[in-house]
Amino acid sequence: DHRDLHSFPTRRSSDLMPVQTGELREFAIKNELFVLNLNKRQGTSIAGQNTALLKEILAWLEPNAPVYGWEQGVSEDAFVDLVSKSGHPMIPCDWSYNHSLTSLLYSQRQKSTLVRVKNPQFLDYTKKKNFVSFFLSDGDNIQWMMNDFKDFYNAAESEEVRMTYGIAASVLPMMAPAQFDNLLSQQKPNCSILEMLGGGYYYVDNYSENGDRAKNLQVVAERLSAHMRQHRVKLLGVMAMNVKSEAAKEAFQAYVDANDQLEGIVALQYSPYAGGEGDVIWVTNKAGYDIPVITVKYSLWNFGNRNAEREGTPAYIAGRLKQEAQQESFSVVCVHAWSNFSDHGQTEDPLIENQSGDIRGAGAAKLCAGHLNDSFEVVNMQELVWRLRMSQRPEQTKKYLSEVF
């Protein structure tokens, strides 16, 4: 009987699995997890959903306990929203295998592998350009990290466009420490690493709104800080339903309070990614330094026969950036991982790049960068953050660089 929940040995995690999915079965058995299918029929909600049961399980789990897996055939917010509001991170991993083995004795297998970072005091801050940084979406996706993420990560264009890659830098070291070390060892010299999305997939503005939100935000922020500091991850990517909301700002403050080594935050909105319109929100850390939360200004996304206001083809987004060019500006562009484009040279057609292409990730960023002019410079996310800090907070940034480096 599913209502006899006290008979389960652990409330520390649960599995959300599509019907007949076998990849997580051994992990669930070994850890004696409660397993639930959201859809009553595989791949569709047409036969109904076990939503009431899911809510009951989420309320029963310990606060901040992870929910592993995924569900197919429904909008992801249909279940991630419930998981997030209940105070749990979603761990997308329904297509990766053998996590009992990949995570075996993970606490004893932690290496002091460090992310490669730049020393910001050596940047030429007299240079004034329209600085643009591209980063790849979906870095919270564990199964992607375990499978073909390497094809995106090692793309030939990565160095040229100073690509920033989101990685599950707090979850992957526990679920597959060997793969985490492997990915960090392959980081290209001019590419940045961004923790995505704060220790699992959840929305920072509604996380644990059904529980003790302030306490649970502090818990996830402190857990996240430990992992980021251990591996010298200086940048954090988060997602919110409304990146400009007061609830989102409350979460930003929690992350900054917990981590005095955090240099900057990138904020995506669930829909559209660029809902923050490039606005910058400043959050003061405990040492008195203002940390920028940079919202995504545009995203490269293939919508087929149309572009959205702030999402579209490389040519379209480059055109928008050029229209807004100033003496100095700072723009974050998210590259939708699952969008492909085609190369048509210096086209003025805002849609033609959507046609039957296989250019993705850093390749798509290169297409966009190729449409920009000499008033622009493409930099990685860490450099963009420090250039923004020096531009907008020069006195405290100079003070920080003189004291820390």
Identify the role of each PLM range.
Residues 1-13:
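Short, small-residue-biased leader/transition segments that mark boundaries at the very start
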Residues 11-33, 289:
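Acidic, glycine-rich loop-and-strand cores that form catalytic or ligand-binding grooves
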Residues 25-159:
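Non-catalytic propeptide/linker segments at domain boundaries
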Residues 49, 175, 216-223, 313-316, ...:
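Soluble or luminal CAZymes and related metallo-dependent hydrolases
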Residues 53-69, 132, 137-163, 170, ...:
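Catalytic grooves of carbohydrate-active enzymes
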Residues 124-126, 151-159, 172-197, 228, ...:
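Acidic (Asp/Glu)-rich catalytic clusters
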Residues 130-133, 161-166, 195-202:
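Glycine-rich, often proline-containing surface loops adjacent to acidic residues and nearby aromatics
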Residues 178, 184-226, 234:
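Long, K/E/R/D-enriched contiguous segments that form extended
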